[in-house]
């Protein structure tokens, strides 16, 4: 955490800023009890050499979560031409079970890469009550997309549908897919680019921070603070996001 020289939060209720995705979030002193986190992994032919790094990234991220039926739930979906869930949000209730399954994930392969269809798949089959989603209970919904190439189908419509359903989308793309991942993400600043997936450890910390301090429903606010844009994040807790960072 890092303290700002000024308190940008209203009524002096949250003096600390938390590093999240290379900007800072000012949070109140309580957090959401749980969240539903879905990892969508590019398993196409393009990522054959990078899939082990993606798998390791998911393991490290899960280690940061407070997994439990009434806490954090996790699902992993792999896609190429088609999408397939390795497990759903209500499949496992312990961190050990999730980690053991993730360690055993194998690259599926396939072409072409249909990221749009995969986004529709997670909306229709994973972020549902039957699959363990608690969206209707007000639990934050997060989707983390890892993509290694440009999609052969449209990504804008299914990504918008997820956002309209209250899903916060974060993304990591390689240089071939970075612009597309920015369009998929809930905000372009929620997307990161790596030269290849072996660089995923370099972005692990900010993404882990984002899982600890969930934000949903971003919209701009005025005025600015010291020339920086103040954004309001709406969820079960109130968070304020300062872009790019406090110095």
Where are the model-predicted features located?
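Von Willebrand factor
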Residues: 30-144, 150-157, 169-183, 202
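Extracellular mucin-like PTS segments
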Residues: 215-235, 240-247
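DG-centered beta-turn motif at the end of beta-strands
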Residues: 41-43, 54, 76-79, 122, ...
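C-terminal helix of von Willebrand factor
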Residues: 23-27, 114, 177-225
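Intrinsic disorder/low-complexity segments
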Residues: 15-20, 233
């Amino acid at each position: 955490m890092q303290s700002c020289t000024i308190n940008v939060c209203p009524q002096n209720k949250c003096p600390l800023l938390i590093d999240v995705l290379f900007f800072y979030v000012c949070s109140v002193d309580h957090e959401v009890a749980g969240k539903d986190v879905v990892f969508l992994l590019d398993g196409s032919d393009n990522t054959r050499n990078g899939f082990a790094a993606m798998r390791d990234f998911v393991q490290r991220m899960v280690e940061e979560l407070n997994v439990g039926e009434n806490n954090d739930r996790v699902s992993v979906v792999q896609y190429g031409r088609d999408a397939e869930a390795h497990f759903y949000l209500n499949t496992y209730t312990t961190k050990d079970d999730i980690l053991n399954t993730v360690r055993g994930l194998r690259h599926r392969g396939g072409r072409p890469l249909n990221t749009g269809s995969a986004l529709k798949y997670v909306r229709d089959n994973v972020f549902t009550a039957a699959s363990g989603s608690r969206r209707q209970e007000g639990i934050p919904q997060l989707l983390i997309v890892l993509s290694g190439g440009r999609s052969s189908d449209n990504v804008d419509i299914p990504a918008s549908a997820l956002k309209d359903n209250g899903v916060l989308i974060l993304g990591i793309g390689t240089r071939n897919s970075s612009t597309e991942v920015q369009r998929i993400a809930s905000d372009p600043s929620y997307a990161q680019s790596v030269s290849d997936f072996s660089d995923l450890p370099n972005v692990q910390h900010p993404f882990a921070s984002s899982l600890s301090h969930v934000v949903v429903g971003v919209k701009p606010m005025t005025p600015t603070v010291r020339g920086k844009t103040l954004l309001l994040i709406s969820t079960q807790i109130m968070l304020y996001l300062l872009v790019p960072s406090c110095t």
